[in-house]
């Protein structure tokens, strides 16, 4: 969901984030439950929004 939040970058990024999210959905969910969304968010958003995901508290 963190990747989808930055879908404002354009349809190309939306497709990329969607593919990445679907591929790592289980991993992302586990990390979210473990409170590691910051690490997952940075890695995911770094390639989609140029690292803006690092602003996630």
Curated annotation (Swiss-Prot):
Keyword list, A-Z: Nucleus
Domain of life, per lineage: Eukaryota
Tissue: Highly expressed in prostate, rectum, and distal colon, and weakly expressed in bladder. Expressed in prostate cancer cell lines.
GO annotations of cellular component type: cytosol; nucleoplasm
Localization in the cell: Nucleus
Region (Disordered): 38-57
Protein name: Small nuclear protein PRAC1
Underlying gene: PRAC1
